[in-house]
């Protein structure tokens, strides 16, 4: 990775003082929290659970999907996931594979198919669909790489691959493979190669110092 790209995707790095607190928290949830708050500690976790609907949904999505046993705790997390799914307008099933560092900018009308795969440090905004195509050569669901920003109203469908460090502009329709380090915009969409495509859009990314 070039120096400019490394700077783009790790603009805000945690201090050494935050690292011990991050290590005492589930690493995936710590990365999600850092994407929202720029810090990781339990007071910040509580504050964002109480006041940030997007993070609250993400938290219980993680907890419910991480529980593999049929326990009362798993049932509790699934109930809360289902409650916030309907309350905030998300359609992201527990079987959906989403990497650490998820950031949902605004709650409402966010649809991600259960067979879609999202990488680390992705941004989702309201009014987006990441869905399935039911026929043709691209029958299936998208696989999306790391550090991908999906703009308002964008639609990503079919068995396609979106590379790392890609910005998908608002209202774009994407049903084809997208190479890494690109901007995609329009309907029909076109690809603009750009090394620092997500600079200023993918921020507050935790590094290995925080076990994320």
Identify the function of each model-found stretch.
Residues 182-184, 188-202:
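Conserved beta-strand-loop-alpha-helix hinge in the C-terminal portion
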Residues 1-88, 199-212:
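Terminal amphipathic alpha-helical/low-complexity segments used for targeting or macromolecular assembly
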Residues 37-45, 62, 70, 76, ...:
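A generic structural signal for ordered alpha-helices
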Residues 88, 94, 99-100, 105-114, ...:
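Left-handed beta-helix
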């Amino acid at each position: 990775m070039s120096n400019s790209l490394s700077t783009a995707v790790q603009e805000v790095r945690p201090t050494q003082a935050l690292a011990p607190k991050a290590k005492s928290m589930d690493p995936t949830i710590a990365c999600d929290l850092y994407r929202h708050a720029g810090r990781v500690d339990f007071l910040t976790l509580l504050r964002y659970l109480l006041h940030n609907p997007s993070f609250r949904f993400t938290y219980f999505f993680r907890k419910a999907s991480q529980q593999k046993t049929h326990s009362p705790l798993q049932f509790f997390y699934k109930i809360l996931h289902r409650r916030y799914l309907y309350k905030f307008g998300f359609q992201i099933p527990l079987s959906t594979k989403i990497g650490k560092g998820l950031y949902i900018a605004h709650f409402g009308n966010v649809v991600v198919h259960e067979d879609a795969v999202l990488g680390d440090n992705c941004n989702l905004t309201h009014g987006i669909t990441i869905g399935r195509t039911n026929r043709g050569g691209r029958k299936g669901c998208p696989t999306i790489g790391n550090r991908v920003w999906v703009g308002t109203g964008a639609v990503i469908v079919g068995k396609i691959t979106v590379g790392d460090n890609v910005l998908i502009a608002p209202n774009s329709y994407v049903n084809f493979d997208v190479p890494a380090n690109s901007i995609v915009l329009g309907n029909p969409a076109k690809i603009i190669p750009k090394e620092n495509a997500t600079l200023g859009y993918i921020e507050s990314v935790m590094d290995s110092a925080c076990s994320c």
